[in-house]
Amino acid sequence: MMLHIALSVLSAATVLAPRSPSFAPPADDLPQLAWELKETGVTARLRGLSPVSRHVAWASGSEGTVLRTTDGGRSWQNVPPPGTAALQFRDIEAFDARTAVALSIGEGTDSRVYRTEDGGRTWAETFRNDEPRAFYDCLAFFDHRHGLAMSDPVDGRFRILATEDGGRTWRVLPAEGMPEALPGEAGFAASGQCLVTAGGRHAWLASGGAGRARVFHSADRGRTWTVADTPVPAGDPARGVFGLAFRDPLHGLAVGGDYRPDQQSPSAAAVTRDGGITWRPAATPPSGYRSGVTWLPFPSFAAVAVGPGGSDVTWDGGRTWRTFNGGSFDTVACARDGSCWASGEQGRLARLRLE
């Protein structure tokens, strides 16, 4: 059964339910979710993902890979910018079947932004980092024109890059509006979700690697920021918040933990209901480290988190999670029409369906 149809029915069934952020339907009424793997023809690790609709989605990753489907995943075309086989496209933001903006990560000039307006047949390099200390991790857009990219700290503060023309041109925003970073603090370019947006002007960025795992918030499209601690594991370069998801300017989820396979990740998820001012640990967290998270378009209290160790779902706004799949994925995202995808190592791409 198509996921967007089934979840529409579930959403309608909850109209008369109590309006509580932690409300979830009875367990017997919950859909059983499953991933349907699709053949991509690549072996790259796909950490960038941007579904547009039931038919159109983009994904990106290592070896300069940029994939595009226009038939709901039945076929994928590899449409990378030429001469980029050595780059890692860890994030991609697509607007439609023809237009997308991709971020390659790395130190110095490896951090670049490319834009296509013809479905990947041609690309324009619109930004190349010339600061050797900068390392860009993630990219996010508020709308078709306004977007941000974030770099690990330079001179003690996270660096923010901004565009006002859909990624055609970029400028570094003044550092004065950004709080000071902690020693060792950085972002994780693991899922394209260390920087996210909601509500037209709000942005959040996630950090780790320091004594506290933190989330920064901007209400003015990246010009000024505040910061809050989270209960997600910290205190080591391998620990922190890896992925964020906000369904509106108030309700958000954070996932992470310790990415090393031999380490435990208790409290791997947290939830906020005040826009990131405060964060609370999930009462029943995911079963391990998770790098990606997304709200399901409907019902509003449902979300999915993924990582190398499996996938989890919450039906109560992030308070409790339960595992529904043991396969490895790095990131997960949904289109507005309800179609959801996950991607990861060895070219893995899957569509979320009812079992």
Predicted regions located by residue number:
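Bacterial Sec-dependent signal peptides at the C-terminal "C-region" and cleavage site
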Residues: 6-29
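Positively charged n-region of N-terminal signal peptides that target proteins for export
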Residues: 1-5
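Residue-level hotspots at or immediately adjacent to binding/recognition sites across diverse folds
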Residues: 21-355
